[in-house]
Design a protein with these regions (language model features):
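Extracytoplasmic thiol/disulfide redox context detector
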Residues: 1-82, 127, 143-155
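Cysteine-centric redox/oxidoreductase cores and disulfide-bonded domains
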Residues: 76-155
Length: 155
């Protein structure tokens, strides 16, 4: 058992996330005294409910007033959420917009019986929203993959 644990620590401990191109999705004053960290899975209906119903009021009362900032981190619960998380990180200048769009329209892209079918829905959805992302290049990007996995491990 100890050998397996050491192997897992070595494997997961060696993930490199020091890529300057990848930024956390943070909303609010960077100097706010309170930091809210939200670990979310893009296929989780409760996470989507939080993002649509709770987050706007939280933003209005605490983030927009400068009292707090919120940092969205990835906690994919399945392969579809993992790929959607990678997509949300592909264009750092649009990450929050992509995240909002994925949660607001979760039922449009999350349905399907296979990962391939869901990926197809996700690809069509991203294109229909006007995001110019090379889907295959993005979901196969090792640095983005490591960034998302590191969030998952930390969470």
């Amino acid at each position: 058992m100890n050998k397996i644990f050491l192997i897992l620590v070595f494997f997961f401990g060696s993930i490199n996330i020091s890529n300057a191109e990848l930024n956390r999705i943070v909303v609010g004053n960077k100097d706010a005294k309170i930091t809210i960290i939200a670990y979310e899975s893009l296929t989780c209906s409760h996470c989507a409910d939080f993002h649509k119903d709770i987050y706007p009021q939280l933003k209005k009362d605490f983030i927009d007033t400068g009292l707090a900032k919120i940092e969205f981190r990835h906690f994919p619960l399945d392969v579809a959420a993992f790929n959607a998380s990678k997509i949300s990180q592909c264009k750092s200048n649009e990450s929050l917009k992509i995240l909002n769009s994925l949660y607001s329209n979760q039922q449009e892209w999350v349905r399907g019986n296979t990962v391939e079918e869901i990926n197809g829905n996700l690809k069509k959805f991203i294109k229909s929203q006007g995001f110019e992302i090379n889907f295959e290049k993005c979901i196969n990007n090792k640095e983005i993959e490591d960034f998302v996995l590191n969030d998952r491990i930390e969470g």
